[in-house]
UniProtKB/Swiss-Prot annotation:
Residues 53-201 form the Tyrosine-protein phosphatase domain. It catalyses: O-phospho-L-tyrosyl-[protein] + H2O = L-tyrosyl-[protein] + phosphate; O-phospho-L-seryl-[protein] + H2O = L-seryl-[protein] + phosphate; O-phospho-L-threonyl-[protein] + H2O = L-threonyl-[protein] + phosphate. Dual specificity phosphatase able to dephosphorylate phosphotyrosine, phosphoserine and phosphothreonine residues within the same substrate, with a preference for phosphotyrosine as a substrate. Involved in the modulation of intracellular signaling cascades. In skeletal muscle regulates systemic glucose homeostasis by activating, AMPK, an energy sensor protein kinase. Affects MAP kinase signaling though modulation of the MAPK1/2 cascade in skeletal muscle promoting muscle cell differentiation, development and atrophy. GO terms for molecular function: MAP kinase phosphatase activity; protein homodimerization activity; protein serine/threonine phosphatase activity; protein tyrosine phosphatase activity; protein tyrosine/serine/threonine phosphatase activity. This is Dual specificity phosphatase 29. Its EC number is 3.1.3.16, 3.1.3.48. Substrate binds at residues 145-152. It is an enzyme of class 3 (hydrolase). It is found in: Cytoplasm; Nucleus. Belongs to the protein-tyrosine phosphatase family. Non-receptor class dual specificity subfamily.
Length: 215
């Protein structure tokens, strides 16, 4: 193949993705812009191949599946104190607070469908607040789950890290994906991108050391 043909076949990365390493090295948000969906999906693909029933993705914060949530004995033995069900409801993972009523577990349900048209963003802040409140106690341990532990639950954990840990979407994806194989659907990725843009804008306006924003 001629060199000219080779050049024309090269696909250039999203311009925002080219800035990611620079932003990470400098610890600055000034050069950061939210990557497109394809570039974000590539970050998930580069992540951990681990896909067990449950994985710790942040200290005392675990993402898991339906089997983990239904295993009352396993939850108690593992020391879980909080459960966030991102697939709450009769036609999803039908647990609820009554399922754990005789256990020392605090429950929070989000009735969400794993389809691109579902607006999960309306639950971002309430779910993030529940996770953050749980982790205020050094002895607590929270499970965030859906049916498979890949899309709905992962999306809410990413939103938590962005809102309460001041991470960009890229930082949050890298943190979660290095510990568990996850991949939110395209609709949820779009909603996370919008959250990322809002938070980055707010942090730039607030300046350094502003702490948690968007609350």
């Amino acid at each position: 193949m001629a060199s000219g043909d080779t050049k024309t076949s090269v696909k250039h990365a999203h311009p925002c993705a080219e800035r990611l390493s620079l932003q990470q090295e400098e610890g600055e948000a000034e050069d950061y812009c939210t990557p497109g969906a394809f570039e974000l999906e590539r970050l998930f693909w580069k992540g951990s191949p681990q896909y067990t029933h449950v994985n710790e993705v942040w200290p005392r914060l675990h993402v898991g599946d339906e089997a983990t949530a239904l295993d009352r004995y396993g939850l108690q033995k593992a020391g879980f104190t909080h459960v966030l069900n991102a697939a709450h409801g009769r036609w999803n993972v039908d647990t609820g607070p009554d399922y754990y009523r005789d256990m020392a577990i605090e429950y929070h349900g989000v009735e969400a469908d794993d389809v691109p048209t579902f607006d999960l963003s309306i639950f971002f802040y309430s779910a993030a607040a529940f996770i953050d409140s749980a982790l205020q106690d050094d002895h607590s341990k929270i499970l965030v789950h859906c049916a498979m532990g890949r899309s709905r639950s992962a999306t809410l954990v990413l939103a938590y890290l962005m809102i309460h840990k001041n991470m960009t979407l890229v930082d949050a994806i890298q943190q979660v994906a290095k510990n568990r194989c996850v991949l939110p659907n395209r609709g949820f990725l779009k909603q996370l991108r919008e959250l990322d843009k809002q938070l980055v804008k707010q942090r730039r306006q607030a300046g350094p050391g502003a702490g948690e924003l968007g609350l």
